[in-house]
């Protein structure tokens, strides 16, 4: 399965949606 993960930080001005496979650590996916 693949999940869409939204990273939101109003203070940092970040609003990113990433695709994350269920066998990948979210921190590893966020680095890519």
Swiss-Prot record:
One of the record's GO cellular component terms: chloroplast
Domain 2Fe-2S ferredoxin-type, first and last residues per copy: 3-32
Chief localisation class: plastid
Keyword field: 2Fe-2S, Chloroplast, Electron transport, Iron, Iron-sulfur, Metal-binding, Plastid, Transport
Cellular compartments annotated: Plastid, Chloroplast
Required cofactor names: [2Fe-2S] cluster
Molecular function GO labels: 2 iron, 2 sulfur cluster binding; metal ion binding
Function: Ferredoxins are iron-sulfur proteins that transfer electrons in a wide variety of metabolic reactions.
Family: Belongs to the 2Fe2S plant-type ferredoxin family.
Protein name per Swiss-Prot or TrEMBL: Ferredoxin
Protein's organism: Porphyridium purpureum (Red alga)
């Amino acid at each position: 399965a693949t999940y869409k993960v939204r990273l939101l930080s109003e203070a940092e001005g970040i609003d990113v949606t990433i695709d994350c496979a269920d066998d990948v650590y979210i921190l590893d996916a966020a680095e890519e």
